[in-house]
């Protein structure tokens, strides 16, 4: 709905001065001339100097900065420490084989392993990391120019893993009938051991009765992939953008840049980390009280680990192909698609754009 409204305003030349967009939409807006090229202004005001390394130049078109990170897009699997303990799970899984062992133990204990809701097709964030471990970014140029098909051996392996998860009873039985918010309620209610989500849920989890019981891990690695495995999505999600019209006013652009200097600077970063229990986009040198903010502390530890930061595959695809990939993955989760059918579905969408 927000994207639709912004598209209508763009057509009427009535866009706000500063506004938020998903990255894929922001890139489309920039290509249509609706957004300002921020490259020189960001350099002049030194704003990029404050950002986390994985967030610098996080939204570019033809090498030009067109957006600034609004949040840290950090995704993976949250888990309930108590339910893991009840099932006799002593170590957080790292490999896919260890992940399936966790699923088996949870099922044996009568505990739903992973809650996820197919009614909201965008809610497969941790699975995007899995796709990246099968070489998504290495194949991206080929996917776009047609030299590589979505129906390739690595992506078939990805979809086969999702299929095997379904066959093993990984997903909540009502997956087809619930969405993201219902899945989150199941997790917070102690009715599922794992939940696929991201940093935006820190606030809700911190305010819950089970805050101290929540852990986090990046999701399984795969021995049948030749690509980098120790990677995690630690990048920009949506972005703040400046309309082309606003950038024509030097005083207005100066005011925007001065605000961003504060927002992404030391004081703004402190406010975000300490007062909102969110992950800041800039380097935070303070100390989080783990007893008061156990989930935030857990996430900051993961953010600062030595796993390589990558962006969300969604940000590198058109909206149509990205949502098609979401549908394909949920299609395999629910048994509607075979791995080959899922890959062909996304390939048909991608080929229409070549």
Each language-model region and where it sits:
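C-terminal capping/gating helix-and-loop segments adjacent to ligand/active sites or protein-protein/ligand interfaces
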Residues: 1, 60, 278-285, 297-350
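Extracytoplasmic "Venus flytrap"/periplasmic binding protein-like
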Residues: 1-51, 58, 85-94, 190-194, ...
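A structural signal for short loop-to-beta-strand junctions that line the ligand-binding cleft
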Residues: 8-9, 14-17, 47-83, 112-118, ...
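Hinge/lid segment of periplasmic solute-binding proteins
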Residues: 23-76, 100, 106, 126-128, ...
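Short, solvent-exposed loop/beta-turn-alpha elements that line the ligand-binding surface or hinge
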Residues: 39-51, 135-157, 207-209, 221-232, ...
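Extracytoplasmic/periplasmic solute-binding protein
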Residues: 64-70, 75, 100-147, 192
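Extracytoplasmic/periplasmic substrate-recognition and gating elements
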Residues: 87, 168, 207-275
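Glycine-centered hinge/linker elements that transmit conformational signals in sensory
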Residues: 103-105, 145-175
